Amino acid sequence: MNKLAFIGGTGVYDAGILSDIRSEIINTPFGQAACQIGYFKGKEIVFLARHGTEHTIPPHKINYRANIYALKMLEVSSIVSTTAVGSLNTEYKPGELVLIDQFLDMTKSRNGTFFDGEFRGVAHIDMTNPYCQTLRNVIIQAGMKNEIAIHPNGCLLYTSPSPRDRTRS
């Protein structure tokens, strides 16, 4: 059975939808990560607040490697993550879901890999299709079933290594 984790971004801070929630601090080789573990319809789900349980960690200080490693330690096999973003596409309306299938990461201030030669050696990872198509299909089908507007393709551009938001340009 696959174990699912949700990583909540700005606006998604807690696992209130889960029952029998317990909080755990997971110690990883990269630091600590705080997780909430609970149940939804009998299935164990892990919730991790990207900005911390009290939303006190700004974007440029998030310990992504500790967070992902903690989920691995908890035997999570699938991750769904939310993020608060703006869009240049006027077809996207507030409240609609854009299920990105590509991304460009232009940030430079964080270590974005486990394969930098220090921890796991050096590896080259194919990022042609960086997201799990099976999980994407499940989300698309659930959206259709529940009449949620989902745009099945999109590219997310990460540019800011700080809490700064976009400009009008």
Which role fits each region the language model picked out?
Residues 66-69, 134, 138, 164:
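Short Gly/charged-rich anion-binding patches and loops
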Residues 1-127:
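Metabolite-binding pocket within alpha/beta catalytic cores that recognizes anionic/polar moieties
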Residues 158-169:
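Single conserved hydrophobic/aromatic residue that forms the stacking wall/gate
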Residues 60, 152, 163-165:
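A generic "cationic amphipathic patch" detector
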Residues 130-160:
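Active-site rim beta-loop-alpha module in soluble metabolic enzymes
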